Amino acid sequence: MSNAVKTNKRILALDILRGVTIAGMIMVNNPGTWAHIYAPLRHAEWNGLTPTDLVFPVFMFIMGISTYISLKKYNFEFSHAAGIKILKRTILIFLIGMAIGWFSKFCYYWTSPTEGISFGTQLWESVWTFDRIRILGVMQRLALCYGATAIIALTMKHKNIPYLIATLLTGYFILLLCGNGFAYNDTNILSIVDRTILTPAHMYKDNGIDPEGLLSTIPAIAHVLLGFCVGRMMLEGGKANEDRESMLNSHLIKLFLVGTILTFSGFLLSYGCPINKKIWSPTFVLTTCGLASSFLALLIWIIDVKGYKKWSLFFESFGVNPLFMYVLGGVLSILFGSICFPWGESSISIHTFLYKILLMPIFGETGGSLAYALLFVGINWCIGYQLYKRKIYIKI
């Protein structure tokens, strides 16, 4: 294996980009109302790409780079200890995702009970929702992609991983072509497989398509592997006596080159294979990984080369505890929508109070919806900043 570039300082831009994506995911998942959202803050209905469609895949790209960094301590050799650690983390992340889904159902049924039922029945209906919990989701996809990437990285020669990525994406494209995979309905092969294995009760409801479904996990794994390969390209093969500035400039050139090639390839191939987040199409992988690589290069230049880092503290608070902050955002969102207090002759949730009573009269429906999302991100940041200030890093 070639000599790895060694530095006495971590690349801050990685934490910042990770923090930007976590803050972005929290923001787009928590508008004041889904009925009034500015267009850039909506996901593409089917084919196409919006700024909102970038936050999750960029985070997954960074996760691939982080996986490379974290596995270096094992010298990329599989061992019983490494395998157990990877398995435990994969299961933990997956179960946390399931737990958030259960907690959401519990709060919904507890605060909206069937009229006329007893306390015991209400409690049972709220607790026992396992027959209708969504099995897959964002955290579950992260878990599966991390686990697969880590095992591949420890058991396969790294020079062969690009061929594996190409095979996965090409095979998935053929599957989409042969299985009506570009149709936005339940005749899509992705929908058929999910409904057969997961059953509709455990799926996201979107024209029969689960955006984090089983088959679309295949290109998502390729996505994280691409991030892993970029991490390897960045951090291996440098000169032992190379100074930090030269190393960072080398990063910039590599990242911009890779970013340009991937982005151009993704857009060019989109004429035959549409860019589509909900099915995680191969062109979606190429385009978003390319843009992520370019974003990272830009941030390295701004933060690590030029030293303009004062503005980045806000995002660093999210970036050093990324998964915890994402989980926190999900839990707080559920609580804000569930916890009610007396207001006039009825009761009102925290979410409704902040949006309809405080913000909507000032900013209007759409502006107030954005203001609520920003306020919610700010509330999460207050907690994240306290952890950051105390150097408390919660690893998930």
What are these model-predicted stretches?
Residues 1-396:
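Alpha-helical transmembrane segments and their immediate juxtamembrane cytosolic regions
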